[in-house]
């Protein structure tokens, strides 16, 4: 597996390990682009905490910040990093399937 895929997948998994960030991503997925204030209205989290998490999600590439009206920044989901993480997991699954198939052959099943 190319090292860049592993590095991107690692960053995505680190970001997804936090339940607050998963909630933010779920809110963006269901409600579309939103500001930190919009997300604070929907989630039981302060706007400041949401802004901190959005900054990390943007660094990883899971969200993108778009300038909006009156200097308000709207955040939108990006699927590319998730697709890389899915590729990483699919490669692991293929490796395990190959090993399990070999074990079944070895055991005579």
Pin down the residues of each PLM region.
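Short amphipathic alpha-helical segments enriched in hydrophobics
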Residues: 20, 32, 58-61, 107
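Short, hydrophobic-biased segments on the C-terminal half of alpha helices
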Residues: 54-55
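A cross-family signal for key residues in well-ordered alpha-helices
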Residues: 14, 26, 58, 64, ...
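Amphipathic alpha-helical dimerization/coiled-coil segments
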Residues: 1-8, 30, 83-109
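A generic structural signal for solvent-exposed, polar alpha-helical segments
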Residues: 19, 59-61, 81, 94, ...
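N-terminal helix-turn-helix DNA-binding core of bacterial DNA-binding proteins
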Residues: 2, 7-46, 69-83
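Beta-hairpin "wing" of winged helix-turn-helix
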Residues: 58-69, 76
């Amino acid at each position: 597996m190319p090292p860049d895929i592993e590095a991107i997948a690692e960053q995505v998994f680190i970001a997804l390990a936090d339940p607050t960030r998963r909630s933010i991503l779920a809110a963006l997925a269901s409600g579309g682009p939103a500001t930190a204030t919009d997300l604070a209205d929907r989630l039981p989290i302060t706007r400041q905490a949401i802004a901190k998490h959005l900054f990390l999600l943007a660094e990883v590439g899971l969200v993108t910040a778009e300038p909006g009206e009156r200097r308000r920044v709207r955040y939108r989901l990006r699927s590319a990093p998730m697709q890389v993480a899915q590729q990483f997991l699919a490669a692991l699954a293929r490796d395990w399937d190959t090993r399990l198939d070999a074990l079944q052959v070895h055991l005579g099943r």
